[in-house]
Amino acid sequence: MACKVTGPNRHLTSVLEMSSFVYWPRSRQQAHNFPMQAVEQKLADATRTLHAKSSLQPSLSIETPKSKENDESGCESSNCMFHPHTIKSEPNFCFAREFKSVPDDFRIGGGDLQMGNNSKRLTCVIDTNRVDMAGILPDNMSFRGLPENKSLLVSAQIEVIPCKVCGDKSSGVHYGVITCEGCKGFFRRSQSSIVNYQCPRQKNCVVDRVNRNRCQYCRLKKCIELGMSRDAVKFGRMSKKQREKVEDEVRMHKELAANGLGYQAIYGDYSPPPSHPSYCFDQSMYGHYPSGTSTPVNGYSIAVAATPTTPMPQNMYGATPSSTNGTQYVAHQATGGSFPSPQVPEEDVATRVIRAFNQQHSSYTTQHGVCNVDPDCIPHLSRAGGWELFARELNPLIQAIIEFAKSIDGFMNLPQETQIQLLKGSVFELSLVFAAMYYNVDAQAVCGERYSVPFACLIAEDDAEMQLIVEVNNTLQEIVHLQPHQSELALLAAGLILEQVSSSHGIGILDTATIATAETLKNALYQSVMPRIGCMEDTIHRIQDVETRIRQTARLHQEALQNFRMSDPTSSEKLPALYKELFTADRP
């Protein structure tokens, strides 16, 4: 196809010169039957619009080259190329027309044909079943002929990936990292002059869309940790492996966007939850909050189970699946980086986590009860007897935690070794979250159905063990001071497991779908807790402080257990097998 321009502005005809015009039919038959006239009309209309925006008023004529018969290998001409390869999960036909120069203010909007910011390429995506045109191809990207050994064409539209620094909408690769314009400018300013940023907290501030400007130190620290550098190569010069990784992430974000989990959902706006009621749980499980119906046990109030009183709104937790004819879809990532077809869930990711947590909590308390230890017997236990009793009481809770982890979206899709590492790194942390449901602040005791065990009766001669006892008590107090509902404890527990996937203190693997789930659950927790604290910034810092305290206490448990094993290896071998399996190996 060629474009001719006539009129008084012939010296500006370079505006309409195109570098290529390419499409891929699924079959030779489709290549013959393709509706070329529809494409010609669309591109002609877009070209006229371009000239109108440029104050040019040429008359245009579209010339179509003579058709050629296609042989088995396909045919090519200078204007169009036929490649009869099967293309999975891509539109039937992709057209692009590139112009050498485009006015800065030129934009084409609408659902049929678009041109992006600073782009010089008009793109049509044609479905032969509907003859519908839509799409955009980013700067410096073009479709090429597919090699014979490939079945999927990936256009690296990196702008669908959120900013790696703050989670805002990205604008491309800047200084070697996919970032938004704000973080690009911030990093540029930090490198253009001598700066001396200071962190007012513990150098672990949250950097996101809401508070990215609150701590320049932590923002720059995150930029550097992600690899931003003035010497970083541009996207077009990335290695093949790096490009493939980015393209995989692009596909993931397209899947999420198609199913209602785009960056707006993953990195959702921080706004108060709706005024109408969501999941309401019996808060009387905390003895110092005497509201609701409770069961008195030795002077303390607890509740074993919680039930929803009203349906949970779909947008309560920031991850609202899209709906087609009443059917909701959510994206899952399978092992190896591929994405299966959308599945139909009963609930959104946060609701499923809460439901699984409630089920395991109910099952655990029904089968094993809580705090079945007579506190009068504890002072008479030997050191080995104390460890054995502790491990025996913890063992059924560990089993419930494992079942809960298996129900979290994406967990079972991870490699088995990764699942084991995640459990080793988080089982004790989640045990603290479960225990917080039965902790009474006034008595500083864990209250069960038969007994209440105050921390004052727990005395250890070993310094590491005594420090662990004190820190467990302090950690439970800090969790309970958040006044969390059981639904919020569920979100906190799931977040502690999944956070290790990408965090510096965890196992540090790259599984973008699991990371997206973790972000969704984290935002759900923030939005649910925020009304009680007053502002989002304080909410984030409070929850982060609690998470840090939980992780530190889990490390103390590991250190105390290691000391016990070294000082009394014979007695440590008598500990339950599951407990030893999860805690005697090195923790990630």
Curated annotation (Swiss-Prot):
Disruption phenotype: RNAi-mediated knockdown in the adult causes abnormally small larval progeny, difficulties in shedding old cuticles after molts and larval arrest at the L3 or L4 stage. Up to three previous cuticle segments may remain attached near the tail. Less than 1% of affected larvae survive to adulthood and in all cases have a strong Dumpy (short and fat) phenotype. Defects in gonad morphogenesis and seam cell (lateral epidermis) development. Knockdown in L1 larvae causes the majority of affected individuals to have defects in the L3/L4 molt. Residues 50-73 are annotated as: Disordered. Induction: Post-transcriptionally repressed by let-7 microRNAs. It is found in: Nucleus. Residues 52-64 have a biased composition (Polar residues). Orphan nuclear receptor. Transcription factor. Modulates expression of target genes, such as Period protein homolog lin-42 and microRNA let-7, by binding to hormone response elements (HRE). Involved in promoting oscillatory expression of the primary transcripts of let-7 and paralogous microRNAs miR-48, miR-84, and miR-241. Plays a role in normal development and required to regulate each larval molt. This is Nuclear hormone receptor family member nhr-23. It comes from Caenorhabditis elegans. The gene is nhr-23.
